[in-house]
Amino acid sequence: MNQDKKGFCFCTLACGKNYRDLALLLAKDIEKYSPNTSFVILTDCPSDFSQQPNVLAFKHRQQSVKFYHDKRFAIAKGLSLFNSCIFIDADMRILAPVPQNPKCISMPGITARGCENMPKKYAKVLAGNPDAKLLKEFKVAKKAASKLNLELENEDINFVYEYLFAVTKDSGKEIEFLKQWEILASYCELNGLYDSEGNAIGLAAAKAGLPVRWSAMEGISFFKNRIEFVRIKKGESKMEDMAIYFEQQTKLEYPERFIGQRIILKSNKLIKYLYNLLRLRILTLKDFDFYYR
């Protein structure tokens, strides 16, 4: 597929058979509804996508303790090939034709389908009634912000929900954004915050001076299971219309396995976690004051 430096691509991270299968399903959606658009996939097994003409698959080895922050590598690869990239979770679906020039890539910076300023994100913490998980997330994010001389409670800093967002080049600010995200990813993971990467995305963008804005992402009709449940609850969608997408995702993401297979997978996951955590601790010793004081 031709790579247009002035155009855009979709991109995702798909490691492990379950997510490779889901990404392949998404690739077929993109081929159908956005036929001239490349889909950049970072994956542990590029050969799984060799028969999918719209996919540009690149070998990826897990870098984060858990995979959440590795999304930045998919974005970096997309931006090395195109002017804009739209990150989309591998377990999502595209449901209708996508415009050749989506509005979400028309402005430099980050345009997210879901984002909110940090005071709103942590309103329960600031009001004094958070749950334990949110409080831990707030404490780690606040310390991370202070390391970059930022104030987490600043209304101009946004938490970015990472399932669907576009990044358009902005005179090199996008490169600094990715650099700061890497720093923040390590800090958050060292402090036990492996997910909620929207904190790192928002703080990194603020530090780099990269604009962040919300958008309804007009022209990108999508399925995301947890979003769809909310739509159904609000009467904006019907379960009978979306049932096939729920069924396909469940079948691929949670396939039936023998108990022996489950034990092996769980053991391998634990070993990888411990290895990646040890690796992170060793690598961050080179900047001891930043990460450990």
PLM regions and their residue ranges:
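Glycosyltransferase catalytic domains, chiefly GT-A lineage
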Residues: 1-293
